[in-house]
């Protein structure tokens, strides 16, 4: 039982750490991308620039 408990906590902490790291990377990339690309293609995005493609890419990260 002790062994099971330990393995469980270990996997949980690992998942949590990975999740946090992922979100951090995502936020950083989003900010960098937005600041650089927003000014250039603002009109294009508003019109509906490849919404499907963007959502797909966003879901992946």
UniProtKB/Swiss-Prot annotation:
Role summary: Protamines substitute for histones in the chromatin of sperm during the haploid phase of spermatogenesis. They compact sperm DNA into a highly condensed, stable and inactive complex.
> In which family does this protein belong, per the annotation?
Belongs to the protamine P1 family.
Query: What is the protein's given name?
Result: Sperm protamine P1
Tell me which UniProt keywords the record has, alphabetically.
Chromosome, Developmental protein, Differentiation, DNA condensation, DNA-binding, Nucleosome core, Nucleus, Spermatogenesis
Q: What is its main location?
A: nucleus
What is this protein's gene name? PRM1
Highest taxon, organism lineage: Eukaryota
Under the GO molecular function aspect, what terms does this record hold?
Answer: DNA binding
């Amino acid at each position: 039982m002790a062994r099971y408990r330990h393995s469980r906590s270990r996997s949980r902490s690992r998942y949590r750490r990975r999740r946090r790291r992922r979100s951090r990377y995502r936020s950083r990339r989003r900010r960098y991308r937005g600041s650089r690309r927003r000014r250039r293609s603002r009109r294009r995005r508003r019109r509906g620039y490849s919404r499907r493609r963007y959502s797909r890419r966003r879901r992946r990260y």
